From Swiss-Prot:
Zinc finger (RING-type) stretch: 70-109
Protein name: Uncharacterized 13.0 kDa protein
Lineage top rank: taxon: Viruses
Keywords assigned: Metal-binding, Zinc, Zinc-finger
GO MF annotation list: zinc ion binding
Native source organism of the sequence: Orgyia pseudotsugata multicapsid polyhedrosis virus (OpMNPV)
InterPro entries for this protein: Znf_RING
Record has Zinc-finger as a keyword: yes
Amino acid sequence: MAATTLTGDDGHFGAARRAGGCVAFTVRRYNRHVVGFSGIRARMLEKLRDAGRLLPADTKCALHTVPAACARCRRSLTLTPAVSCLPCGHSCLCTDCDQLFANVCFECKSAVQFKLRFIK
């Protein structure tokens, strides 16, 4: 399955294809000053499910608490956006370290079907 990157804000998305890997939803306008990151992730998943926006409605997606630091490089995930792996829901890597682990969750080693990435 080719990777798909969504860009834009709110309800406006464009899709670009990348070679290999899982489907990665990339969302611009990550606000590092917003503390409720789990709420942002949950709302974004609902938007992607609504009106057939690339995420199948029956996809099971758990969302776990985001740790304070990236599990690999230890960079603060308060200042750097985390990547959420789906369906397991772990958000243990920063966007830079996530590039090294294409189809496997760093924390639980399960297969990743979708990724929810936030960029500045």
